[in-house]
Amino acid sequence: MIKLKNIEILKYKSFTTPQSINIEEDITVLVGMNESGKTSVLECLAKTNYFEDDEKFKFNETLDYPRKELKSISKSDSKPKAIICTYHISDELIGLIENRLGKGTWQGSNEITLTSSYGDSSTLISGVSINFELFLKHLNLSDIGDDVKTELKLALTEEKFDQILKKFPDETERLEPLRKYFFKSSTWMTFIERYAYSVLIKRHLPKFIYYDEYYQLPSRIILESFLDDDVDLSDDLKTAKALLDLSEINVNELINADDFEDFIAELEATEALISDTLFQYWSANQNLNIEFKIDKKTATVKRQVNTSYGSATTVDTNIVEHVLDIRVKNSKTRVSLPLQNRSKGFNWFFSFLVWFNKIQADSNSKYILLLDEPGLNLHATAQADLLRFLESLVDKYQVIYTTHSPFMVETTKLNRVRTVFSDSDSSIVSDSIQQKDPNTLFPLQAALGYDVAQNLFISKKNLLVEGVSDLLYLTTISEYLNANKRTGLNEDITIVPTGGAE
């Protein structure tokens, strides 16, 4: 119902000048060198509406505002703006709003913007506009006096609404149904626009989930780490917590249990579901499976006791930790190793699926996936598997990922690519794939070069063109002709950009 359409980063870390980035409805790829600002884009976006309460994903003026300009805003009373997000609202959602507030009440367009600022993490919403007269008509209140209408239109809080009821006691019975539209406090222009956003729109607003290599599952997990809810977990333990949550394991019950078989069975059931997905897209080795074991770590303590024969020393054995051990077994070689001792690529893929399954379990929210350098340790063929997996998600999720790997760029979908590079003053993001910086373009050039080599060997009919723009023009024109029942390029012809004479 709501899709992210555009973001404009105003001030964030290496972004010192505003950068507008168009977001695709399915997958958007940020390509650039290390330290170009790719990760900053994902971080800044995640902090606008993160899926859980995490201090790491809240705007921090000291840590996030461009360092060179920090002094200039330190004495200012107003909080600087960080990012503007533009969302597209579907006609279906507008229909739901009008079903609740009255036909024709929505006066805005199909876009709303959310501006996030530093400091109190406040958000300015624009684009929500409700026709007040039609709203009153929907509630059969069109005939109330003009003075009452004026007071209502200016009322923003429930307290002010109560004052109106006291001022117009004869209208109390008719106006009382309006109470549910008011809030305790509000900074909106009208109470009904606040209601439209907070009750009808906000719950459909997608949340962001960020994932990078630091979220990979550890091989050994100390279960006592999860007993204190007030302790901030490290990124890898957050993924471990997601695994336990998916398995519906109560850590307190596990720690106090004498036998762990039931808990291991729950973990194995969850692992089986995740592995079913994993091996659909993991073609490197189909002989791997995950094993779980729960160990008790004990310690001995000596103490003095008094007996009828005098003082004596006794030794107590106490359980100090419960450890969940995660291992990967190769059914072909019959060798098992700790998870972190297997390939980093396999660990990344499995850990990501654990993290991803956590949000899939929440059917009440929509998500946008932010993946920082996904599959960095994957082999080229495994990266192709990862791309297939990401493609399978686009019906339900928008995906934005960063990369500098040529194997994570689909040459047939270059419209998804945004180049990120840094000049002397600011990080810059561009829709153009013809930047002059060769280092920024290297993944694209390498991907196209690989595609050319593959096509020349595999495809029987190749149409050689000068550059990428020619490929895009011809492909677009051909698709347009086909859509209008005219003749486009034959499907067995592969367009191959050669890079020109330069």
Q: Where in the sequence are the language-model features?
A:
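Switch/communication elements of ASCE P-loop NTPase nucleotide-binding domains
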Residues: 1-51, 266, 270-280, 293-299, ...
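Short, polar loop/linker segments at the starts of domains and inter-domain junctions
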Residues: 19-21, 99-101, 221-237, 427-431
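Conserved P-loop NTP-binding catalytic core
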Residues: 43-110, 255-264
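Flexible phosphate/Mg2+-sensing switch loops adjacent to catalytic phosphate-binding sites
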Residues: 50-80, 184-194, 292, 367, ...
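A general structural signal for short secondary-structure junctions and capping/turn motifs
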Residues: 72-79, 104-107, 116, 197-206, ...
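Short linear interaction motifs
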Residues: 96-98, 174-203
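Acidic, Mg2+-coordinating catalytic modules of nucleic-acid enzymes
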Residues: 105-111, 124, 203, 446-464, ...
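Coupling/switch segment of ABC-type P-loop NTPase heads
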Residues: 108-165, 196-285, 306-309, 317-321
